[in-house]
């Protein structure tokens, strides 16, 4: 019997102000763990899989039940340790310490590969936490929509004179991360054609309004895109097809999109990418019989797709890797020039990271959407001079369906995160918000990740693979008084290719929370400015000086 599979489970986080734990500082991680497994949030909640191939919230259902049980009894001066989704210890600490410390899928570097991890996983000794799956702060596809929107907008500025009108994007994958692409693309003014092999994922994105139309015909999909471009009304199309097949077919036809990228779960060739000419059922069967054959076939198909991406780039398409490590997989399969198209971070996002700007997010523990709308208004009030941010908040309210507990993602940086959090805390204190909020971020942030094929690709000083930075980030956030802190390996790009840390903190309206919020949400983004200043980025050095960061080795 698979201890990770239970189709009878239907997890819904409690709403409102009634506590089932001893304080909001333990109620919050409990609700957020449960929210990660909400049927409208998780990809396969019956298997504890939240997103990203096999990114889980807990190691198995026995561990999940025990985590909930412990959180409900945890005292305000105790800390729960969670090792790869398993609650392994409760220790006496102090009231300002994190209530939960999480470490997921960390392996000694020599053994940090999928083969060794999969052996441990089979024995029930490990769990792949992805980024926000195992750290209990996943908010559905909204969590990546704004970052994707900002990237597509930056591509329009860089490649199309600032206008995306009449332009279209070709991409793959409609899972938990990839599902953001069609909505982000149309919000940025493009039409979007997304290939997906799992029809249930297309249907889910249709239901939540992330995708406009669905077809299983490439000809029909291209006709939809063409009609939308002529009418000036962007459309997103979910095409039931294998991305490798479609990308190669477009090269064959001489059809060149304006933008090409991909967000299939290529980081995990065993569980995340369907080889060409395979059905989902056959792949599931083969994973049990011959894992090596699945990996080989998946990588061969990735090589086909990447060769097509390179050909489309040569034909004039703006082509970028969107952080799933597909270039690395193709390179290992013999595509020597796989890295000839850039990753999205060095190409479009790094200047934001230099100012500590990244995917700040918050969740209304009340379950009341009005609490989020009130915080949206507060963000506009406190940041009045950022029309792009205001536009994002307006579009998000209009077009993004909440998944599970209501939440918001908002890319802000060092100068704004702490003051926004303190304002939210005051709103809880005054009763303007009906219950506390949790504030966190993706692990994809400026100071919390080392990932040479994604966030830290092509660093100015060559420090791409130095992972001291996320370790220091996690330790500093623990010392600063976050509510829960996580340290993971392999998120986004797969085992052996990244280390990263997460942080979440509760705003419960108390004066004590205000002190912790001010510390954590200043120190956390400040480590990103520090990391980029240390690497030699002038924008980061300027930001550090303007914000009076004490960086001993930075020239005054």
Curated annotation (Swiss-Prot):
Source taxon at top rank: Bacteria
Cofactor-binding details, from the entry: Binds 1 NAD(+) per subunit.
Catalytic activity, reaction form: 4-imidazolone-5-propanoate = trans-urocanate + H2O
Alphabetized SUPFAM superfamilies for the sequence: Urocanase
EC class of the enzyme, as a word: lyase
Molecular function terms, GO-annotated: urocanate hydratase activity
Residues annotated as the enzyme's active site: 410
Keyword terms of this UniProt record: Cytoplasm, Histidine metabolism, Lyase, NAD
EC number: 4.2.1.49
Cofactors (names): NAD(+)
Subcellular location: Cytoplasm
Pfam families: Urocanase, Urocanase_C, Urocanase_N
Lipid biosynthesis found in the keyword field: no
InterPro entries: Urocanase (IPR055351), Urocanase-like (IPR023637), Urocanase_C (IPR035401), Urocanase_central_sf (IPR038364), Urocanase_CS (IPR023636), Urocanase_N (IPR035400), Urocanase_Rossmann-like (IPR035085), Urocanase_sf (IPR036190)
GO CC terms: cytoplasm
Family according to the record: Belongs to the urocanase family.
PANTHER family: UROCANATE HYDRATASE
Role according to the record: Catalyzes the conversion of urocanate to 4-imidazolone-5-propionate.
This protein's name: Urocanate hydratase
Organism: Shewanella sediminis (strain HAW-EB3)
């Amino acid at each position: 019997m698979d201890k990770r599979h239970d189709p009878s489970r239907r997890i819904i986080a409690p709403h409102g102000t009634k506590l089932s734990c001893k304080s909001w500082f333990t109620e919050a991680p409990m609700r957020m763990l449960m929210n990660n497994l909400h049927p409208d949030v998780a990809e396969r909640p019956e298997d504890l899989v939240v997103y990203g191939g096999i990114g889980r919230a807990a190691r198995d259902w026995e561990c999940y039940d025990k985590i909930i049980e412990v959180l409900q009894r945890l005292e305000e001066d105790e800390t729960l340790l969670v090792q790869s989704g398993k609650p392994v210890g409760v220790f006496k600490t102090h009231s300002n310490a994190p209530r939960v410390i999480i470490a997921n899928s960390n392996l000694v570097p020599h053994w940090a590969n999928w083969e060794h991890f999969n052996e441990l996983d089979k024995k029930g000794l490990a769990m792949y936490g992805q980024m926000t799956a195992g750290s209990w702060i996943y908010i559905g596809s909204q969590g990546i929509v704004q970052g994707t929107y900002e990237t597509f907008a930056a591509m329009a500025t860089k490649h199309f004179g600032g206008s995306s009108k009449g332009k279209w994007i070709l991409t793959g994958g409609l899972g938990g991360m990839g599902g953001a692409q069609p909505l982000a693309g149309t919000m940025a003014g493009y039409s979007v054609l997304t290939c997906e092999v799992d029809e249930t994922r297309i249907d889910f994105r249709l239901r939540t309004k992330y995708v406009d139309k669905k077809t299983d015909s490439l000809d029909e999909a291209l006709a939809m895109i063409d009609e939308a471009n002529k009418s000036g009304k962007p459309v997103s199309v979910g095409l039931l097809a294998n991305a490798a097949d479609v990308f190669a077919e477009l090269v064959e036809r001489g059809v060149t999109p304006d933008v090409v990228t991909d967000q299939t779960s290529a980081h995990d060739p065993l569980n995340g990418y369907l080889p060409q000419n395979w059905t989902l059922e056959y792949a599931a069967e083969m994973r049990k019989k011959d894992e090596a054959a699945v990996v080989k076939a998946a990588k061969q198909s990735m090589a086909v797709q990447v060769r097509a991406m390179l050909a489309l780039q040569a034909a004039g398409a703006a082509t970028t890797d969107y952080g799933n490590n597909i270039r690395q997989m193709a390179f290992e399969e013999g595509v020597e020039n796989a890295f000839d198209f850039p990753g999205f971070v060095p190409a479009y996002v790094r200047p934001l990271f230099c100012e500590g700007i990244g995917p700040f997010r918050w969740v209304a523990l009340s379950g009341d959407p009005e609490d989020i709308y009130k915080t949206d208004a507060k963000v506009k009030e406190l940041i009045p001079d950022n029309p792009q941010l205001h536009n994002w908040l307006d579009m998000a309210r209009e077009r993004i369906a909440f998944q599970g507990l209501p939440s918001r993602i908002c890319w802000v940086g060092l100068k704004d995160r702490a003051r926004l959090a303190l304002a939210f805390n005051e709103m809880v204190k005054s009763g303007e918000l009906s219950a506390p909020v949790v504030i966190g971020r993706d692990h994809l942030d400026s100071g919390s990740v080392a990932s040479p094929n994604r966030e830290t690709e092509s660093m100015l000083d060559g420090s791409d693979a130095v992972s001291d930075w996320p370790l220091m980030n996690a330790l500093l956030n623990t010392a600063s008084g976050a509510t829960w802190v996580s340290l993971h390996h392999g998120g986004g790009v797969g085992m052996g290719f990244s280390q990263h840390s997460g942080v979440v903190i509760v705003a419960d309206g108390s004066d004590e929370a205000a002190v912790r919020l001010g510390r954590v949400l200043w120190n956390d983004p400040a480590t990103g400015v520090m990391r980029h200043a240390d690497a030699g980025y002038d924008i980061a050095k300027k930001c550090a000086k303007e914000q009076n960061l004490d960086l001993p080795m930075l020239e005054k």
